[in-house]
């Protein structure tokens, strides 16, 4: 069977990249499918990350790049395309994109999350400069 992997990971945020690293450490064939222009997921929109052990004050873009580089160093394979259909009710799962059809014994969905914008005036322009979407993440930036 062509394009058969032990694991296909859909999403390349921190969870997807962690799954890719662990799959390679376990000597599994894997493919990570990402729809976005860069790996990292929602963290890419974060100005400064202060709660990731060992990398205090790293930007979200740099953290995403660091996680991607780690996965690549382990031998992770990536494809930039959007998944349009999943067939998960058979032993060999099918993942279809616009361009390709892949097969896997296991599919990991790590599609992440996205904050919900309020769409109020100034929200976009002030995001990261007073407008925040995570009180737990950003609360320390606003303490007196």
Language-model features: where?
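Beta1-alpha1 glycine-rich phosphate/pyrophosphate-binding loop at the start
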Residues: 5-74
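FAD-binding core/adjacent interface of flavoenzyme oxidoreductases
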Residues: 1-10, 31, 38, 45, ...
């Amino acid at each position: 069977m062509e394009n058969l992997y032990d694991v296909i990971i859909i999403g390349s945020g921190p969870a997807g990249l962690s799954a890719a690293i662990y799959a390679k450490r376990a000597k599994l064939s894997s493919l990570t499918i990402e729809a976005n222009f860069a790996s990292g997921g929602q963290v890419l929109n974060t100005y400064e990350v202060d709660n990731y052990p060992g990398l205090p004050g790293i930007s979200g873009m740099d953290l995403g790049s660091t996680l991607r580089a780690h996965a690549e160093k382990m031998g992770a394979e990536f494809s930039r395309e959007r998944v349009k259909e999943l067939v998960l009710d058979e032993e060999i799962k099918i993942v279809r994109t616009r361009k390709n059809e892949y097969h896997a014994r296991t599919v990991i969905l790590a599609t992440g999350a996205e904050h919900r914008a309020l769409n109020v005036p100034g929200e976009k322009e002030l995001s990261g400069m007073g407008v925040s979407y995570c009180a737990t993440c950003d609360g320390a930036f606003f303490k007196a």
